[in-house]
């Protein structure tokens, strides 16, 4: 494309190439809208079709996964691995198992992952993968057979210096273990090709907690910079999975009163706030095969908002930790009307562009996911470092490194987001991540 083209021309070009990939188009629009003024001031980043290369994955692998269920019936699922950008290191990003998974969602996640990984300062490129397989309601044997069948194709595209996947929605330690085991068998090589592994075979302490902990570390830094803090604040958390659970735990440790958790069926509201004992029970319920927050609400006699999200509950801080586009403009209006002070994304792109704009216009502190939830992939990078050195660090060391990385990410966001009373963290995160990747791409020529 012409280096002098407008923002809308560029976005139309992206939309025209993939007209049905709405999630991916949304992610590109969000990033490029904040980048464009910076690009106009720094035209060297328009050279060598850099932007066109940046929004096109280096490689997309699509394949079928054929497996047998417990009734000995043949099941067929689709799977993908999007190897988006390797300019600063091997592709790095999770595997997602959920019926909603499609190529558009994985491209959006891989695109976001590229900038997120760059923000960590660790040498990791961006990638993402997954399948429309739904692990919910499946037996452990069915999950294992699916994971093993998937790896019979995927293994040939992975390697410690090529592509290192991890977990995501629907993929926890169990699934990572099944996939890593099959990879080892097929490749006859025990090198690190997955992160989020169990401690018994190369996993890192703090990795399960890292995304939730990192979210709170970043949010606390953002609050402190503006004369606030978690102490005494009412917090709404959406979701009740891994990220939400550890975000609740760390927010409580910082003195917050967390009053909500949710799943796809509804929201539990606890005005007295979670306690360590209550959180432990929620984790037990969610770990069961069909556990729901409704079960938790009934057990403790709490308010349950069936079919609703947490955003109608008056809070000071909102931490969306469930899924993309869960917080729309109507929910944003309610949060703002109820006096919300800060919103930080624990999930990937959980806030719509319109809602994000509304928060920024209202002066609400807003932390985008590529910065706020980078703790998970940062600790994955630390797991890779431990594996490469044949070492296992103590939990305190990993947690300290995680905290330091999140503070560095916050500093980078402030540097590029405007060092004033209200930093634009969306702009700061996008520019900081972009500069790291773009400089590497320009230095390596047209490839």
From Swiss-Prot:
Pfam families: ELFV_dehydrog, ELFV_dehydrog_N. NADP(+) binds at residues 211, 242. It comes from the Bacteria. It is an enzyme of class 1 (oxidoreductase). Substrate binds at residues 92, 113, 116, 167, 380. GO terms for biological process: glutamate biosynthetic process. Homohexamer. Catalyzes the reversible oxidative deamination of glutamate to alpha-ketoglutarate and ammonia. PANTHER family: NADP-SPECIFIC GLUTAMATE DEHYDROGENASE 1-RELATED. Belongs to the Glu/Leu/Phe/Val dehydrogenases family. This is NADP-specific glutamate dehydrogenase.
């Amino acid at each position: 494309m012409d280096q002098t083209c407008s923002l809308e021309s560029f976005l139309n070009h992206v939309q025209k190439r993939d007209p049905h990939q709405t999630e991916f188009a949304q992610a590109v629009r969000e990033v490029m809208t904040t980048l464009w003024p910076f690009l106009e001031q720094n035209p060297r980043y328009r050279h060598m079709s850099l932007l066109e290369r940046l929004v096109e994955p280096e490689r997309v692998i699509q394949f079928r996964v054929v497996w047998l269920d417990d009734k000995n019936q043949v099941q067929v699922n689709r799977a993908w691995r999007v190897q988006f950008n390797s300019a600063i290191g091997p592709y790095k990003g999770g595997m997602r198992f959920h019926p909603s998974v499609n190529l558009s969602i994985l491209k959006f996640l891989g695109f976001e992952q590229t900038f997120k990984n760059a923000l960590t300062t660790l040498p990791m490129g961006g990638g993402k993968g997954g399948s429309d397989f739904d692990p919910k309601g499946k037996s452990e044997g069915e999950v294992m057979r699916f994971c093993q069948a998937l790896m019979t194709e995927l293994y040939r595209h992975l390697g410690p210096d090529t592509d290192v996947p991890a977990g995501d929605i629907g993929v926890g330690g169990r699934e990572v273990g099944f996939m890593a085991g099959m990879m080892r068998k097929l490749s006859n090589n025990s090198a690190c090709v997955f992160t989020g592994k169990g401690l018994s075979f190369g996993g890192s302490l703090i990795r399960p907690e890292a995304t939730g902990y990192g979210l709170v570390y970043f949010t606390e830094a953002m609050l402190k910079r503006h004369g606030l803090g978690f102490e005494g604040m009412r917090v709404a958390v959406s979701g009740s999975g891994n990220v939400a659970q550890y975000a609740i735990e760390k927010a409580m440790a910082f003195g917050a009163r967390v009053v909500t958790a949710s799943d796809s069926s509804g929201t539990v509201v606890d005005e007295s706030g979670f306690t360590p004992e209550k959180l432990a029970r929620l984790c037990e319920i969610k770990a069961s095969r069909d556990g729901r927050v409704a079960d938790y609400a009934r057990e403790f006699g709490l308010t349950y908002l069936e079919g609703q999200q947490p955003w109608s509950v008056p809070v000071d801080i909102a931490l969306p930790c469930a899924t993309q586009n869960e917080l729309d403009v109507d929910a944003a209006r309610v949060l703002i009307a109820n006096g919300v002070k800060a919103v930080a994304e624990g999930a990937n792109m959980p806030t719509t562009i319109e809602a994000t704009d509304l928060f920024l216009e209202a002066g609400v502190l807003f932390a985008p996911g590529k910065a706020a939830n980078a703790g998970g992939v940062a600790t994955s990078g630390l797991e890779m470092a431990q594996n490469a050195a044949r070492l296992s660090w103590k939990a305190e060391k990993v947690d300290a490194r995680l905290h330091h990385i999140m503070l560095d990410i916050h500093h980078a966001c402030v540097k590029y987001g405007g060092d004033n009373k209200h930093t634009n963290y969306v702009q700061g995160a996008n520019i900081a991540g972009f500069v790291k990747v773009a400089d590497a791409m320009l230095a390596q020529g047209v490839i």
